[in-house]
Amino acid sequence: MGERTPMLKMVGVSKSFPGVKALDNVSLMAYGGEVTALMGENGAGKSTLMKILSGVYKKDEGKIFIEGREVEVKGIKSAEEAGITIIHQELSVLNNLTISENIFLGNEKHSKFTGRINKKLLDERSKMFLEQIGCDIDPNRLVSTLNVGEKQMIEIAKALTKNARIIIMDEPTTALTDVETENLFKVIENLRKKGIAIIYISHRMEEIFKICHRVEVLRDGKYAGSAEIKDIDNDKLIAMMVGRTIEDQFPYRDVKKGDLALEVKNLSCKEGVKGASFTLRKGEILGIAGLMGSGRTELAKTIFGEYKRTSGEISLNGSPININCISDAINNGICYLSEDRKKEGCILGMSVGENMTLCNLKKYENKFKSLDKKEEAKDIEYYIKKINIKTPNKEQFIKNLSGGNQQKVILAKWLMLSPEVLIIDEPTRGIDVGAKKEIYELLNELKASGKAIIMISSDLPEVLGISDRIMVMSEGRISGELNRDEANQESIMKLAVGINN
């Protein structure tokens, strides 16, 4: 039996930007009727490679073959003509148009007689393409009435109208519920059966092993290898991605606990927290687990002063404090890293340095009330080095950094204020495995230095691996607390769903 021809073959692809070589002699293969995972840490070059394939960027060197024939991708239009479509993490549907108008946007069907758009034909063809992916939605509905999962189906149907043979999906389940994710997997299976090659980018390992057939790995802008999914496990895949074996994903450090740092008594807020009481010591990481909507983030935001408490007391170092707003919390040494770093944690249009000192500008005021840029720059460079922020310089826009490095910048912003209590909400969401371990090591260092840390996470292995104690919330209340040595996923989930033994 002869060797099968891949649907897609990229050979020797290189791409440079000013000051950085993003891709260096990268190769990639994907087969029709298969789902190929494209893996790598943030900054490995995945997005750049896919932007070259989909016509957003032009390659400096290299060749692209589709079914053995070399093609020249000069732009988005030529990529689509070659049968290549990308479905971005941020969906590009237009909410003010109907489903059929979105599906055929730029490719409308016109009446032979009037020259006007043939709405009836658009609706009929839209229904046909939607049925092909098992989606039963009225094509006349406005896209604004759809949920995220349904909007994603519109993007996939749109790809089919362009005779897509290769569909790239970039972090497709990030904003989906569990039910929507399962529906997407069914659609991917239907596409696969049609002979379409799917390139699937995700940080979620469980998804890779569930739906993918092969994996292609990039590391530091270079090709790091490929494998059949059946031939590798989680540890081998991580080793390919980071270039080293991660024996221990969660480097827990046991340190001596200090005095009581934070005490919360009977705290409530109208956003959903009901009578929460707990303590936190210096040199301790308190993990908070719970299902979505359990009140974890609301509790954090109430302590931080973003939400107004309706009852309860907060004490710091044994003395009651009054927190009515965020500045009250910051002035008392309480800082909060939001679960949504792009919307609430940083300003994407500002530089790394500007984001770092944003909350601490008064420190750099001279007697003329202007900024002492030299002193500011010294502190910025210190933290860039101290917590290993990978950036060309402090002037780089934070939006150009990987998720892990953005998180480090936000952490540095708060560390510059020397907080006593640090609340971190979903600290490694959307961050690759290598950067995760760096964040964990950093939290361990902060704990060892006497900081009191609250870590909210939906990742149970993370909560179990890093925390000294675990507090579980359910429906706005604290449903239980577990010591590190007695906690496991089952005991946490029982408390999370309200089963108290």
From Swiss-Prot:
Protein's cellular compartments: Cell membrane
Organism from which the protein derives: Clostridium perfringens (strain 13 / Type A)
Alphabetical list of SUPFAM superfamilies matching this protein: P-loop containing nucleoside triphosphate hydrolases
Catalytic activity, as annotated: D-ribose(out) + ATP + H2O = D-ribose(in) + ADP + phosphate + H(+)
Top-level taxon of origin: Bacteria
Membrane topology: Peripheral membrane protein
UniProt KW keywords: ATP-binding, Cell membrane, Membrane, Nucleotide-binding, Repeat, Sugar transport, Translocase, Transport
Gene giving rise to this polypeptide: rbsA
GO molecular function: ABC-type D-ribose transporter activity; ATP binding; ATP hydrolysis activity
Coiled-coil segments: none
Name of the protein in its database record: Ribose import ATP-binding protein RbsA
Subunit structure: The complex is composed of an ATP-binding protein (RbsA), two transmembrane proteins (RbsC) and a solute-binding protein (RbsB).
EC top class named in words: translocase
Residues annotated as domain ABC transporter: 8-245, 255-500
Pfam families found in the cross-reference section: ABC_tran
EC number: 7.5.2.7
